[in-house]
């Protein structure tokens, strides 16, 4: 359990990490949620998630970050992993081109199981190993642009762009949710007493629903 401040939030956003084994998904998760990095390359089997609450304007957003934790090795990721996700970081290792070559397959699997409105960022991890780079920045950037994805290069080791990557995705999700709520208000779609999932909480309320975009 986090401290009281950690428990006070307006929205919960589920964000999934996907990509090949060994690209640094778990370290991106631990760097963002706990500011930790592990040099131990052993893979833990089983789905896990961590949370961190961030402020976007006056709204407290609880980011629930899910990690496949090795299941991708066995093609054992199920639809339950993607269910309810409103954001995804599709991670590849920019020092191993083979992890980038299968990005399109991961994107297809994501769209097969997740909502079409999910916010997706392509992440080239391990930017600290620039001398070993196998994937040009512009190649990955163009792929992202052509597929409507956000794009950043990160280093979980030295923290470069890790905060920015997660916060950019969360801001994009929040913008979509805010726009959806405005549209609902315009069309009188919100019924008193039975607001939609992910409804913003009033003063003093601390519980929240997961968002569906």
From Swiss-Prot:
Motif (Switch 1): 35-49
Keyword Hydrolase applies: yes
GO cellular component: cytoplasmic vesicle; Golgi apparatus; pseudopodium; pseudopodium membrane; recycling endosome
Propeptide stretch(es), residue numbers: 211-213
Membrane topology label: Lipid-anchor
Cofactor section: Mg(2+)
Top EC class for this record: hydrolase
Motif interval(s): Switch 2: 67-84
Annotated EC: 3.6.5.2
Modified residues (Cysteine methyl ester): 210
Compartment(s) of residence: Cell membrane; Cell projection, Pseudopodium membrane; Cytoplasmic vesicle
Activity regulation (UniProt): Regulated by guanine nucleotide exchange factors (GEFs) which promote the exchange of bound GDP for free GTP. Regulated by GTPase activating proteins (GAPs) which increase the GTP hydrolysis activity. Inhibited by GDP dissociation inhibitors (GDIs) which prevent Rab-GDP dissociation.
Record's keyword annotation contains Cytoplasm: no
Function (record text): The small GTPases Rab are key regulators of intracellular membrane trafficking, from the formation of transport vesicles to their fusion with membranes. Rabs cycle between an inactive GDP-bound form and an active GTP-bound form that is able to recruit to membranes different set of downstream effectors directly responsible for vesicle formation, movement, tethering and fusion. RAB25 regulates epithelial cell differentiation, proliferation and survival, thereby playing key roles in tumorigenesis.
NCBIfam families given in the database record: small_GTP
Protein known as: Ras-related protein Rab-25
Organism from which the protein derives: Bos taurus
């Amino acid at each position: 359990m986090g401290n009281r401040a950690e428990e006070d939030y307006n929205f919960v956003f589920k964000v999934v990490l996907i990509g090949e084994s060994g690209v640094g998904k778990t370290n991106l998760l631990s760097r963002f949620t706990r500011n930790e990095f592990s040099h131990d390359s052993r893979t833990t089997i089983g789905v896990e998630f961590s949370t961190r609450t961030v402020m976007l304007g006056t709204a407290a957003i609880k980011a629930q970050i899910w990690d496949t934790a090795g299941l991708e090795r066995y093609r054992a990721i199920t639809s339950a992993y993607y269910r309810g996700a409103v954001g995804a970081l599709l991670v590849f290792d920019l020092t191993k081109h083979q992890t980038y070559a299968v990005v399109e397959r991961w994107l297809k699997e994501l769209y097969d199981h997740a909502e079409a409105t999910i916010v997706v960022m392509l992440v080239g991890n391990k930017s600290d190993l620039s001398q070993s780079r196998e994937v040009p920045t512009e190649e990955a950037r163009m792929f992202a642009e052509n597929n409507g994805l956000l794009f950043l290069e990160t280093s979980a080791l030295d923290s470069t762009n890790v905060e920015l990557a997660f916060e950019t995705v969360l801001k994009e999700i929040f913008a979509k949710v805010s726009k959806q709520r405005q549209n609902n208000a315009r069309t009188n779609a919100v019924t008193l007493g039975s607001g939609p999932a992910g409804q913003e909480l009033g003063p003093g309320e601390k519980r929240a629903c997961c968002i569906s975009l």
